[in-house]
Amino acid sequence: MRVDLLAGTVYAPCMGSEAPKILVFDSGVGGLTVFSELAKARPDARFVYAADDAGFPYGRLTEDELVARVVAVMDRLIERHAPDLVVIACHTASTLVLPPLRQRFPIPFVGTVPAVKPAAALSRSRRIAVLATPGTVARDYTRDLVETYAAGCAVTLVGSRRLAALAEAELMGAPGSDEDVLAEIAPCFADGEGGRTDVVVLACTHYPLLLPRFERLAPWPVTWVDPAPAIARRVVQLLGAPADLRADGEDREDEALAVFTGGAGVTEPLRRALGARGLARVAIESMPLAQA
C-alpha cells in the first residue's frame, strides 16, 4: 500500500496562482518523483528541474560542504531561472540547508523531511523503519523526529549507501540486480516478539523510483510512505490551485526544462525517461563541485 500523507487536507493559498515558475532541486534524478506529483497538481506551472549531478552523491560531503554547495548552486539557478518557489526535493539537503536558503533568498522554499509522524500513526504493529541515506540517518533532526513523533514505536533507521545510485542507474538504463536491491532494503524488515515491521518511510526521494521492485522483493507486504504527494499539496497551499489551463487544452509540459550541473550521466535512456515525464528539454549548466 502507498500513502498520500495529506490526502483530504485543504489549505487556503497565500500566493497568487497564475502560471508560477517552480524550481525542483535534487542532487540527482530522485526529485523526479516529486516533480511528477507537482506537475499533476499544477499542470499550468512552468517547471525547471535541476539535478546537481556534479555534486552527487551529497553523502560524501561534510555538513559545511553540503550547505556551501547547495547555497552556491542555488545562487546561480535562481539568478538564471528566477523561480517563484523552490522545492528542495532531497532529504539529505533539506535537513541542513533550508534555514540558510530562506535567510538568503526572498522566495518560498519547500523542503523534504522524513515522514516519521504519519508512519507512526499508520503502524498497527508499532514497528516502523526509516529507509534513508547515511547522512539523513545521522542527522540530529531525524532522531528528534523519532523521539517526538514515534516514541511509542520500535524504529529501525536504515542508512543505505547504494540505493540512490541504484535508482540513478535504473533511469539511465543500467538497472542493478534484484539481489543488490534486496540487500539494501532487507534491514528494514524486523520480525520479533513484538510483531513485524508494517510501515517503511521512504526518506530519500530517489527511493520511490525503485518502489515497484521494493514491493516485489519485500519479504512481506508493508505500507510504503512516499513524501511526494504531500510536498505537492504543500506547494498548492502556497501557490493555490491553477486558475485555468490553456485555452487550447494543452498544459505547459513542453516548456519544462531539466538542468544538470555535470551531465556525465545524461544518457539516451535517461533523456527518454525525462521526456516521458514531461521534461523533453535538457540543458547542461556546468557547475563543477570545486568551483560551485
Model-derived segments and spans:
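Non-catalytic structural scaffold of enzyme domains
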Residues: 6-292
